[in-house]
Structure formats: structure tokens, C-alpha cells
Curated annotation (Swiss-Prot):
Top-level lineage group: Archaea
Organism of derivation: Methanopyrus kandleri (strain AV19 / DSM 6324 / JCM 9639 / NBRC 100938)
Reaction(s) this enzyme catalyzes, per UniProt: dUTP + H2O = dUMP + diphosphate + H(+)
Official protein name in the record: Probable deoxyuridine 5'-triphosphate nucleotidohydrolase
SUPFAM superfamilies in the cross-refs: dUTPase-like
Record's keyword terms, sorted: Hydrolase, Nucleotide metabolism
Gene Ontology MF terms: dCTP deaminase activity; dUTP diphosphatase activity
Role: This enzyme is involved in nucleotide metabolism: it produces dUMP, the immediate precursor of thymidine nucleotides and it decreases the intracellular concentration of dUTP so that uracil cannot be incorporated into DNA.
Top enzyme class: hydrolase
Length: 154
């Protein structure tokens, strides 16, 4: 079952009014990073992320160069209830503009900043203002779910 706007208003009462949607909440762009160096996912739990270099804004606007992967850090920090999972979906304006946003599932009990990968597939740079809504979080009730015990949240 997808949690609707009125349930989400109770769970997240401090959002801006424009973040509440009928079937989710919009997350806003906070910080942007370029990936540098090598990462790896090896046997067992051997994970190595590439280095992240923060991208500065020009007058509050980030510029995504063509065919470069960027990590977008979103606001606000989320605390996902233990009986809920979250699907993160890109805003359709980005897709219609040639910017793909790659996401993952938010596990029950995860708490922290959400980061997604974005790639501008257009030939020209794409500009996004700090604080713009870029991803919609859709909350799904998860029966008999375990709790998040990964490396990236608290």
C-alpha cells in the first residue's frame, strides 16, 4: 500500500508545502558531487566508493556537464519508519530534459541523507537551482520487514 499525502504530512510535518504530493514527498537538491578516482565492489563486503568532489554553485545554480555522472545529495534527511520502504523516482521534468536520475530502494529504518546519481545526456550543460525538487519519495508499507543495517545511514 502506498502512503498518501495526509499520512505523510503526519510523518514529515516540517516540509515546505510544495514538497507534499498526493502519493509521496518531493526531495530537494542540497549538494552536488563529481566522482573522482576508482571505486570497487569486491567479494564479501569489500566496498570502495570513488572520491566525491563537491561542485560549487554559480549564483545558487549547479551546472551538470554532458555525460558526466554526478551524485546529488537531497534534503531533508529522512528517517524511514521501520514498517515502510521508499522508492525514489525522478521528477519527470528532468527526464524530459535528458537528465537521468538513478536511484535505489530506501530500506525500513534507514535514517540519513539520500544520495542519487544523475547524468545529463543532452549535448549542452543542464542547470538546476539549489533547493529545486528533483526526486519524489514514494512510501510503501512493508509487512514483517527487517531493519536497515547498511553502511550509509544511521
Amino acid at each position: 500500500m502506498i502512503l498518501g499525502e495526509y499520512v505523510l504530512r503526519d510523518l514529515f510535518p516540517d516540509l515546505d508545502e510544495d514538497q507534499y504530493q498526493p502519493a509521496g514527498i518531493d526531495l530537494k537538491l542540497d549538494r552536488v558531487f563529481r566522482l573522482e578516482g576508482r571505486g570497487a565492489l569486491l567479494e564479501g563486503d569489500d566496498k570502495r566508493l570513488p572520491e566525491y568532489r563537491e561542485v560549487e554553485t554559480e549564483g545558487g545554480v549547479f551546472e551538470l556537464e554532458p555525460n558526466v555522472p554526478y551524485v546529488l545529495e537531497l534534503a531533508p534527511e529522512l528517517e524511514i519508519p521501520e514498517d515502510t520502504a521508499v522508492l525514489f523516482l525522478p521528477r519527470s521534468t528532468l527526464l524530459r530534459s535528458g537528465v537521468s536520475v538513478h536511484t535505489a530502494l530506501g530500506d525500513p529504518g534507514f535514517r540519513g541523507k539520500i544520495r542519487v546519481l544523475a547524468v545529463n545526456h543532452h549535448a549542452a550543460p543542464y542547470r538546476i537551482a539549489h533547493g529545486e525538487r528533483v526526486v519524489q519519495a514514494v512510501f510503501l508499507r512493508a509487512e514483517d520487514a527487517g531493519r536497515y543495517e547498511g553502511d550509509y545511514g544511521r
